[in-house]
Amino acid sequence: MHKNAAHTYVIASLLVFSLTGCAWIPSTPLVQGATTAQPVPGPTPVANGSIFQSAQPINYGYQPLFEDRRPRNIGDTLTIVLQENVSASKSSSANASRDGKTNFGFDTVPRYLQGLFGNARADVDASGGNSFNGKGGANASNTFSGTLTVTVDQVLVNGNLHVVGEKQIAINQGTEFIRFSGVVNPRTISGSNTVPSTQVADARIEYVGNGYINEAQNMGWLQRFFLNLSPM
C-alpha cells in the first residue's frame, strides 16, 4: 500500500518537473559579465637619472595641455546618449483564381447508359472554379532615449574602447535595470565626454525589471505548457 503511494508520488513529481521544463523559457541577458571595471595599476617607474623619461607607466592623473581629457584607459568613464529609433513594416498579398467548364452530349445514348439518361439525346455540363485571396502585414517600432554613463573595460589594439555599464532604478517594490555594452571610437566622443548610441558598434542595450509588476506580465508555466501543446 505504502509502496504504491510512494510510486505514485514519484511519478507525479516527475510529471510536474517535466511540465515545468517544457513550459519554462530561459532568459539570457544580452549584456553578460561584469558591468564595471577597475583601473589597472601601473608598474613603479624606474629612475634612470635622466630628465626625460622615454617610457612612463599609466598615470591616471595626467592631464594633457593641448588635448581634451577623454577616456583612454581602463576604468575611465563616458556618457552614452541613447537615441534609438527603429521602425519596420512589411506587407504582402496574393491572388489566384481558376475557372473550368466542360460540355459534351450523346446523340444516341449507349445501351449501358440508358438507365441513367433514357433513350433521348443527353447533354452533360460540368463547371468548376477556384479562387484564393490572401493578405498579410506587420509593423514594428521601437524608441529608446536617455543617458547612461559607462566604464571602459578593455582597450583594443586599434585604440577603440570597449565599454560596459549598468543603471539600477528602484521604484516601490520593483527594480528597473538598464545595461549597455559596445565598442566606441574615441574620435566620436564629444568635448562633453558623450557619444550617441547610434555611433557605437556592436551595441547591446537591455532594459529589464523585476518585482510583482514584471511577474504579472509573465504567463504562468502551466498556461504556457498548454499553449505549446495547443494546435490552434
From Swiss-Prot:
Q: Which protein, by its recorded name, is this?
A: Flagellar L-ring protein
What job does this protein perform?
Answer: Assembles around the rod to form the L-ring and probably protects the motor/basal body from shearing forces during rotation.
Family, according to the entry, reads as follows: Belongs to the FlgH family.
In the UniProt record, the signal sequence range is 1-21
Per the record, GO CC terms? bacterial-type flagellum basal body, distal rod, L ring; cell outer membrane
What are the transmembrane regions? Answer: none
Organism of origin: Escherichia fergusonii (strain ATCC 35469 / DSM 13698 / CCUG 18766 / IAM 14443 / JCM 21226 / LMG 7866 / NBRC 102419 / NCTC 12128 / CDC 0568-73)
Q: Where is the lipid attached (N-palmitoyl cysteine)?
A: C22
